[in-house]
From Swiss-Prot:
PANTHER family xref list: SEX-DETERMINING REGION Y PROTEIN, SOX TRANSCRIPTION FACTOR
Ranges of Basic and acidic residues composition bias in the record: 194-204
Compartment(s): Nucleus speckle; Cytoplasm; Nucleus
Gene3D superfamilies in the record: High mobility group box domain
Disordered: annotated span: 175-204
Family annotation (SMART domains): HMG (SM00398)
Keyword terms, alphabetized: Activator, Calmodulin-binding, Cytoplasm, Differentiation, DNA-binding, Nucleus, Sexual differentiation, Transcription, Transcription regulation
Protein name (database record): Sex-determining region Y protein
Amino acid sequence: MQSYASAMLSVFNSDDYSPAVQQNIPALRRSSSFLCTESYNSKYQRETGENSKDSVQDRVKRPMNAFFVWSRDQRRKMALENPRMRNSEISKQLGYQWKMLTEAEKWPFFQEAQKLQAMHREKYPNYKYRPRRKANMLPKNCSLLPADPASVLCSEVQLDNRLYRDDCTKATHSRMEHQLGHLPPINAASSPQQRDRYSHWTKL
């Protein structure tokens, strides 16, 4: 990776502004974008635990508690009676109704929840609840990525690309001034060839 990065940066830092170098710029730019994408994907897999041994355990659902045992049928009933009600509003209503129940009314659902938890322990003896991390949003640019070699290369390539364009513009103007400085002064006695040559350089 370092040798490839050095090769890319050497091209951008070179003083050669030949057409061959300019043609290589889009290809190098695509390569740097690929490296940034691969870097983010690797980081995302490490954080979310994808393709790991723990991913199977993370997919195991937690056993329902007493409230979920009770609200399982109540939610379905309320949704049928109020088809336009949002799920968040239904959850608020169910939470309020659950608080209004007495301990005696809640007791059967606590017993059912204990049975479900016992069955869950027998089926998954090594289960341990692990809250999932919220997935990070894809950064808009590579500057938000971690400081690994690929992300550092991406930011350096973008910076050197801007410097390359600025240097190309300066070099072009410098060459034009140099050429114009060696042209003979134009006057009424100048030949048509000299006038055409002067007109060509001033239009660049």
